[in-house]
């Protein structure tokens, strides 16, 4: 019969030694102790082989499998970094990506309130980034976008600060950390721009180096159709859009709200381009009804 003490020593050494070195040492020690019992030599060898195999499969193979999976993810991310995936979505698939009617209404209402408050207080603004893309390409909110972006000149920051309480009176929350964020059910980001040489750039330009305007691109501001309302935007948006969103007039990029946010996976979602179809070109719905809240002040 296999010695109980030898088996216990074998298990103790496995759980208390580091890595495969400790594993091999304890296995050798157990093998020596067990096999010295001549009366049970053949039985002990079989038991030892079974035990060794089970432990090898349950530890080494699990580690190996994890490494294979990790390597596969890295390879997939690498491929997507170097090659775009072009996908055509059916109308039914597009509908799955669309924001809800409640979100769409809250975004249009937020844009309407912001436009009226800033205009009423003589603060010049323009739609920016994805909001600008939505106005140019969809004549409204991009159907799978979930926030709003506008820009103002830094000279108007003090005037903006003076009217922030009016946003709060409308039930919005106001936050500030480099950019101003106006939040209800959805949020609107206000970027502060300044002129540097021949460019208008904003305070987090280092993070978005392609988001700038040349003087002739920005001024004079003009109006854009945005759902059921009108908003102000740059004079010539094409240069800015081409820099930020190459092939924006042919393809859409849909970002998943369920991202794992892992650095090596950051390009997986960004590298899928969806061919623009009539359904994808429709703005977020519904466009209204919207309330006239600012005029109540």
Curated annotation (Swiss-Prot):
Coiled coil ranges: none
Highest taxon, organism lineage: Bacteria
GO biological process: glycoprotein metabolic process
GO cellular component: membrane
Compartments where found: Membrane
One Pfam family named in its UniProt record: LicD
Gene Ontology molecular functions: transferase activity
Domain RPE1 insert, chain residue ranges per copy: 9-55
Keywords, sorted A to Z: Membrane, Transferase, Transmembrane, Transmembrane helix
Residues annotated as transmembrane: 62-82
Membrane topology: Single-pass membrane protein
InterPro entries, sorted: LicD/FKTN/FKRP_NTP_transf (IPR007074), LPS_cholinephosphotransferase (IPR052942), RPE1 (IPR005728)
Family classification: Belongs to the LicD transferase family.
Record's protein name: Uncharacterized protein RP688
Organism: Rickettsia prowazekii (strain Madrid E)
